[in-house]
């Protein structure tokens, strides 16, 4: 494994630790804002606020005119962004940590590339198709579904910390560029509805999932986070998931080590996390994982050594010999003697 691969694994775990801390902080923030919601006063964004938040002067159109293309209007207690309809040249918009319930004014921003609307009171991320939007973040709102999201160049979509029960409306034809989907910390009861062929990174931790289903054909998926769910079995994985390298199943309910055999068809899986599952308390836990998945390089936080691999290979060979004997029809058969 290359040094770059090592760094990728460390980055994945570090991102997870930081995200866990972020979720806790946002949950505290959400409780505070919900308690204070009755005290919110209507606060529309004003020209003065726009003047303060605008930056990045660029040429527009034929290059003879100029306009500011970046707006930061974060944490201003905003409830209304209607004024943005007239700022059609904006490409980068941050309206996080406000009290916004309606983002329809953003439909006019047809040049928008980057949108951050975290920590508001949105119940939907629905917008008109924005042809150039590449990154959109709606984390820690009150969003209840995934309908109305169809931007052809959207590569990263963050919906963590919302109230989504089911994934619907994510059309692979209209989200053909989506490579990263963040749904951590919702109320998902199923992984169905996520057939997005270009998807590389999928974050489903801290939901209510009991099984994996509907992900079998995600052939480009490299990272799958399923931590802190209620998964008991490892059904739902297939050899079509030929790019999957990192699988995090920490803090689920997997008790039977035999379930690990269902991961053998993942040809590129090299890092698996199963900490805080009942099966991780078994005596032969690490050995059994390597016996089932010869290509595995790391289990939880520890890498396998050469001695571990040699021992696992011996066990595999012994099991194969025993299986071959069981299948041999001539083994231990009494010789046939014709009657006298």
From Swiss-Prot:
Component of the axonemal radial spoke complex. Interacts with RSPH3A and RSPH3B. Interacts with RSPH9. The lineage of its organism: Eukaryota, Metazoa, Chordata, Craniata, Vertebrata. Residues 305-328 form a coiled coil. Its main location: cytoplasm. InterPro entries: Leu-rich_rpt, Leu-rich_rpt_typical-subtyp, LRR_dom_sf, SDS22/Internalin_LRR. Expressed in the testis (at protein level). Keywords: Cell projection, Cilium, Coiled coil, Cytoplasm, Cytoskeleton, Flagellum, Leucine-rich repeat, Repeat. Gene3D superfamilies: Ribonuclease Inhibitor (3.80.10.10). It comes from Mus musculus (Mouse). GO terms for cellular component: cytoskeleton; cytosol; sperm flagellum. This is Leucine-rich repeat-containing protein 23. It is found in: Cytoplasm, Cytoskeleton, Flagellum axoneme; Cytoplasm. Residues 1-38, 317-340 are annotated as: Disordered. Residues 205-340 are annotated as: Interaction with RSPH9. Residues 277-315 form the LRRCT domain. LRR repeats lie at residues 89-110, 111-134, 177-197, 198-219, 220-241, 243-264. PANTHER family: LEUCINE RICH REPEAT CONTAINING 23 (PTHR46652:SF8), LEUCINE-RICH REPEAT AND IQ DOMAIN-CONTAINING PROTEIN 1-RELATED (PTHR46652). Disruption phenotype: Mice show male infertility due to impaired sperm motility but do not show compromised respiratory ciliary motility. Disrupted assembly of radial spokes seen in the sperm flagella. One of its GO terms (biological process) is radial spoke assembly. Essential for sperm motility and male fertility. Plays an important role in the proper assembly of the third radial spoke (RS3) head and the bridge structure between RS2 and RS3 in the sperm flagella. The keyword Repeat applies.
